[in-house]
Amino acid sequence: MEFIIKSLLDTDLYKFTMMQAVLHQYPGAQVEYRFKCRTPGVDLARFINEISHEIDGLCALRFSKEELDYLRGLRFMKPDFVDFLGLFHLDRKYLQLRASTQVSGEIELDIRGPWLHTILFEVPLLAIINEVWFRNTSMLNLDVGRARLDAKVRLLKGESGYEECSIADYGTRRRYSRQWHAELLPLLAQGLGSNFVGTSNVYFAKQYGYTPLGTMAHEYLQAFQALGPRLRDSQVAGLEAWAREYRGDLGIALSDVVGLDAFLGDFDLYFCKLFDGMRHDSGDPFKWGERIIMHLESHRIDPRTKVLVFSDGLDMNKVMRLYQHFRGRCRLAFGVGTSLTNDLGPTPLQIVIKMVRCNGQPVAKLSDSPGKSMCDDPAYLHYLRQVFGVSADV
């Protein structure tokens, strides 16, 4: 049986864009990531040897010349970074996998090491764990996936007024299998036509000629809680470092690392002008969009010149409701994940790998959705909430 991950490009674009910034600005940063399965009753421990075998396959991969040439052709990738990737591989020594001694059936997966050398682990590891689970606990039925995908496409295309609704695939980490992901994308592109704008997956973007999409993830801004000059200024430091790296390119800022209130407090006129838009990834998307529009208008910036990217738990119905609500008031883009890549019948797993430490200091995300925060230091979490004025129910 071939390995699940066949290419180091089989990951999200933002891993490479963040990795490039790390190489140029924080090559010595040390980090720790931790795996968590939020779905109760999932016995991953019985498949730990299979998962471990797949990790061995992942760590044996190198970038091919063809893959490096592809990356070199992306306007925001710098030659020295692509040259570095030519020497790169994921090293198993930074990863620890074991069955939990605390909770029967759970696994413990920790990643510790240089940020530069561990940042590419997360997405393929999640894809591996998903696929190992589903191929052992369910029967693959692509006909169900095809029928459900067709219904979603017809739902959008059957209504007028959605001609400029931009939809992208963001589903690599939660996919049912690589096989389904590979089949899904051409079907989606054919069905949606001009509504389909690309994928976050670099491998499939290369294979099919789609636009690879993505900018930054939570881990990037979280790390600045340890890298920045002081905690209160960590978000500003992260955004300024991004601006230094990309000089106006890749200008979508993530708004929910320490909550929307703190983000808007930091996102001043300078950032409003500099960045192309913002991404929503937790909390009520309608309230979020209204507040973003009000914030832009308060700085005398026309929201119609900025893009609001929605990427939190979307399905086609939610995409259509959001599009109708905000159309004409701003530019819109939608990143759809699990609803596309893991809707074949079995219940998708809620699994994540989150950064929990940087340079020995705890870091955390204070999401706009209760229960999504993840930190191994309750005292730090309390302090972080206090510094950014975030209530304890987040």
Curated annotation (Swiss-Prot):
One Pfam family in the UniProt entry: NAPRTase
Alphabetical keyword list: Ligase, Phosphoprotein, Pyridine nucleotide biosynthesis
Entry keyword Ligase: yes
Transmembrane helix in keyword set: no
InterPro entries named among the record's database cross-references: N/Namide_PRibTrfase, NAPRTase_N, Nic_PRibTrfase, Nic_PRibTrfase-Fam, Nicotinate_pribotase-like_C
Listed GO CC annotations: cytosol
Enzyme Commission number(s) of this protein: 6.3.4.21
Pathway: Cofactor biosynthesis; NAD(+) biosynthesis; nicotinate D-ribonucleotide from nicotinate: step 1/1
Catalytic activity: nicotinate + 5-phospho-alpha-D-ribose 1-diphosphate + ATP + H2O = nicotinate beta-D-ribonucleotide + ADP + phosphate + diphosphate
GO molecular function, one term: nicotinate phosphoribosyltransferase activity
Reported modifications of this chain: Transiently phosphorylated on a His residue during the reaction cycle. Phosphorylation strongly increases the affinity for substrates and increases the rate of nicotinate D-ribonucleotide production. Dephosphorylation regenerates the low-affinity form of the enzyme, leading to product release.
Gene3D superfamilies the record matches: nicotinate phosphoribosyltransferase
Function: Catalyzes the synthesis of beta-nicotinate D-ribonucleotide from nicotinate and 5-phospho-D-ribose 1-phosphate at the expense of ATP.
Protein name from the UniProt record: Nicotinate phosphoribosyltransferase
Organism encoding this protein: Xylella fastidiosa (strain 9a5c)
Gene designation: pncB
